[in-house]
Regions:
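Intrinsically disordered, low-complexity cytosolic terminal tails
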Residues: 1-102, 573-587
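Hydrophobic alpha-helical transmembrane bundles of multi-pass membrane proteins
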Residues: 55, 80-587
Length: 587
C-alpha cells in the first residue's frame, strides 16, 4: 500500500516524474560490474556475456548527439517521462547516452520568442497583402453582374430596348465565360491538386518531419499565391511601361499558383533545416525573383517555356541549392547533417506516403505542363507529349534500376526517376511535333536520372550537400536539359510549320523567325540561371545575417508543433528502440 501510495502521489505532483539519483547510481554500478565481468571473459578467451542487448555496444559506438536524438535529458542528468503515459524504464545516462531502454519520451522544446515573432510578422504581412489586392485588382468584366449575359430561359420580350448587336455582345461574353469555366478552371483545379497533394505528400519522405512538411507546404502555397498576384502585376506593368489594374480570373490565378510550385521545388533543399521565420523570408524573396524572371522572359523576351522547365524546375532547384550552400556553409553544420542519412530519417510508411504524392504528380503533370499554352492545339500537344515522356521515364527507370541492383529495384530510383520525363519535356511540349521524340526524351531522362541518383547523389553527400529530395538531380538537371532541347525543336519548325502559323500561334503575333527565337531561348536559360543563383546566394546571406531563427534539431516536428508527433531517430550503431508495447502515438 505504501509503495502504491508513493507512486500515485508522485504522478499527481505534475506532468513529469523522474527516477531518483539512487536508482541511477545503482544502474551505473551494475553496468560497471558487468563490464568488469566481460573483461574477465575476454581475458579467458571466452565469449562475453551481456545482461541486455543494449550492453553489447561500447560507449563510443552508441554515442549520439543530444540535440539530434535525446532532448529529454536535462542538464542535471535526470531522465524525464510523461507521467501516466509511458512505463518508466531504467536508464544510464551521462548526458547523451542511453544504455538500457526500449522506449524514449520526447519532451517538446520550450517556446521561443521567435515563435511569437513569426505569428506577428505573418499577421502584418497578411494585412498588407489584403489591402494591396483589394486596391489594385478588379473583377474581370465578363464575370461582373453589370456585364452578365441574358439568361436563355427568359423571354427576350423583357429586353425590348436591346439591339441585335447588344445580344451578340452578350452571347460572346457568355461563350467566353463558359470556355473559361470548362477549360481554365479544370487546369486550375489540377494544378492545385498537384501543388497541395502532390508536393505535400512528396515532402513527407522524412518520417520525423512529415507534419512540418505538409503544414509549410500549405502555408507556402497560400502565402506565395497572394505575393505572386501582386508582384506579377507590378513587373508586368513595369515591362509594358504602362499602368493598369489587375484582373481576377483563372488565367492570373494559374500563373500565381504556377510560381508557387517553383517555391515548393526550392523547399526540397531546405525543408526541415530552417525555422519558420526563415521560411517567410525565403517565400517573399523567391516570389519577387521568380515573378521578375517570369515576366522578363515571358513578357519582354517572349521565351517559349509552356510547362515551366525554366520558370519552375530550373529556377527552383538552383535557388534552393544556392540558399543551402550559404546557410550551411560552416563545417560544423554540414557534419551535423551527415548524421541524417536517408536510411535513418525515412521508414517504410514515410516512403509509402511519398510515393502517393509522386503518383498524384504523375497523374496531373499533363495539366500542369499545358496550363500556360496559348491555344487549344498547343494544349493538345502538351498533354500528349507529357504523357508519352512520363511513360518513357517510368519504363527506363525500372530497367536501369534493375541493372544497377542485380535485378532488384531501388525505391529511390523508381520514385524520382518516374516523373522526371514530365520535367524534361515541360519546356518543349508545345513545339515537339513528334510524339515518338517525347517518348525518347522521357526514356533518356529516366536513364540519366537513375544513374545520377546512384552515383552523383553520393558525391553531393560527401561535399556536404544533403539533398534528401534530390532537387538538383530530379528538377535541376532535367529542367536545364529540357531548356536546351527547346531551341532545337524551334529551329526545326521552319521545315514543319508554315511561317505565318508559327508567328501567330507560337509567338503570340510577334514577328520573329524560328532561328532568332532559338537564340533568344538560349539567352533566357543563362538569364534564369543567373537570377536564380545570384538571388539565392544573396537571400541566403540576408537570412543568415538577419538571424531569423534557429532550430535545435533537424527534421523534427516538435520544433513547430505543440504535440510530439515524430518517432525518435537514432544512429545506426544504436539498438532499435521501437517496441511492440509502445503506445500508437510513440511508434
Amino acid at each position: 500500500m505504501s509503495e502504491s501510495g508513493e507512486s500515485n502521489s508522485q504522478k499527481s505532483e505534475g506532468m513529469y516524474s523522474y527516477k531518483s539519483d539512487n536508482n541511477n547510481n545503482n544502474n551505473i554500478n551494475n553496468i560497471n560490474n558487468n563490464i568488469d565481468e566481460n573483461n574477465n571473459h575476454i581475458s579467458d578467451n571466452k565469449p562475453p556475456v551481456f545482461e541486455s542487448e543494449a550492453m553489447r555496444r561500447t560507449l563510443n559506438e552508441i554515442k549520439v548527439e543530444q540535440n539530434q536524438n535525446f532532448r529529454n535529458i536535462n542538464p542535471s542528468g535526470k531522465t524525464f517521462f510523461p507521467s501516466g503515459s509511458l512505463k518508466e524504464r531504467d536508464y544510464y545516462t551521462n548526458g547523451t547516452i542511453p544504455l538500457r531502454s526500449s522506449q524514449i519520451s520526447v519532451v517538446i522544446p520550450p517556446e521561443s520568442p521567435l515563435h511569437w515573432c513569426f505569428i506577428l510578422i505573418y499577421i502584418i504581412l497578411e494585412v498588407i497583402l489584403i489591402t494591396l489586392i483589394a486596391t489594385l485588382f478588379r473583377w474581370d468584366k465578363r464575370n461582373h453582374p453589370e456585364y452578365s449575359c441574358i439568361p436563355y430561359n427568359e423571354s427576350l420580350l423583357n429586353y425590348t430596348n436591346l439591339t441585335i448587336s447588344d445580344l451578340n455582345i452578350f452571347d460572346s461574353i457568355y461563350l467566353e465565360t463558359e470556355k473559361e469555366l470548362t477549360t481554365y478552371y479544370d487546369l486550375f483545379k489540377d494544378i492545385n491538386i498537384m501543388a497541395f497533394v502532390g508536393f505535400g505528400m512528396l515532402h513527407t519522405l522524412t518520417k520525423g518531419n512529415s507534419w512540418n512538411s505538409i503544414a509549410f507546404n500549405i502555408l507556402s502555397i497560400v502565402f506565395s499565391f497572394q505575393l505572386n498576384l501582386f508582384f506579377d502585376l507590378i513587373f508586368e506593368n513595369a515591362f509594358k511601361e504602362s499602368w493598369k489594374f489587375g484582373v481576377l480570373n483563372f488565367q492570373t490565378f494559374i500563373e500565381a499558383i504556377f510560381h508557387s510550385c517553383c517555391i515548393l521545388v526550392s523547399f526540397g533543399g531546405i525543408l526541415g533545416k530552417v525555422s519558420h521565420t526563415q521560411f517567410l523570408v525565403l517565400i517573399i524573396s523567391e516570389s519577387i525573383l521568380s515573378s521578375l524572371n517570369f515576366k522578363l522572359c515571358d513578357e519582354k523576351l517572349k521565351i517559349i517555356d509552356t510547362g515551366g522547365s525554366l520558370y519552375v524546375h530550373t529556377f527552383g532547384a538552383i535557388f534552393g541549392f544556392a540558399v543551402f550552400i550559404v546557410l550551411f556553409r560552416s563545417k560544423k553544420k554540414r557534419e551535423k547533417l551527415r548524421n541524417y542519412t536517408k536510411e535513418t530519417i525515412t521508414n517504410n510508411f514515410s516512403r509509402m506516403t511519398c510515393i502517393v504524392g509522386i503518383l498524384f504528380m504523375i497523374s496531373y503533370f499533363p495539366s500542369f505542363n499545358s496550363s500556360l499554352a496559348l491555344s487549344d492545339d498547343q494544349r493538345y500537344r502538351c498533354v500528349i507529349n507529357t504523357y508519352y515522356a512520363i511513360i518513357g521515364s517510368i519504363a527506363s527507370s525500372f530497367i536501369i534500376s534493375g541493372f544497377l541492383n542485380n535485378g532488384k529495384f531501388n525505391y529511390e530510383h523508381i520514385f524520382f526517376g518516374s516523373f522526371s520525363g514530365g520535367i524534361i519535356i515541360s519546356g518543349c511540349c508545345s513545339v515537339c511535333l513528334d510524339h515518338w521524340a517525347a517518348l525518347l526524351l522521357g526514356m533518356i531522362c529516366g536513364i540519366l536520372c537513375v544513374i545520377f541518383l546512384e552515383y552523383l547523389s553520393r558525391l553531393f553527400f560527401q561535399f556536404g550537400f544533403e539533398d534528401i529530395y534530390n532537387i538538383l538531380i530530379v528538377h535541376g538537371i532535367p529542367g536545364i536539359l529540357g531548356a536546351f532541347i527547346t531551341p532545337m525543336f524551334i529551329g526545326d519548325l521552319s521545315r514543319r510549320v508554315d511561317d505565318i502559323d508559327y508567328h501567330l500561334v507560337l509567338l503570340n503575333d510577334m514577328v520573329r523567325d524560328n532561328h532568332a527565337q532559338a537564340g533568344i531561348q538560349v539567352g533566357g536559360i543563362f538569364i534564369t540561371l543567373a537570377i536564380a543563383f545570384v538571388g539565392g546566394i544573396t537571400v541566403g546571406f540576408l537570412t543568415k545575417v538577419a538571424r531569423c531563427g534557429k532550430i535545435f534539431s533537424y527534421y523534427d516536428d516538435n520544433e513547430f508543433f505543440s504535440e510530439g508527433m515524430n518517432e525518435v531517430t537514432i544512429n545506426n550503431n544504436v539498438t532499435n528502440l521501437e517496441d511492440d508495447n509502445q503506445p500508437s502515438f510513440i511508434k
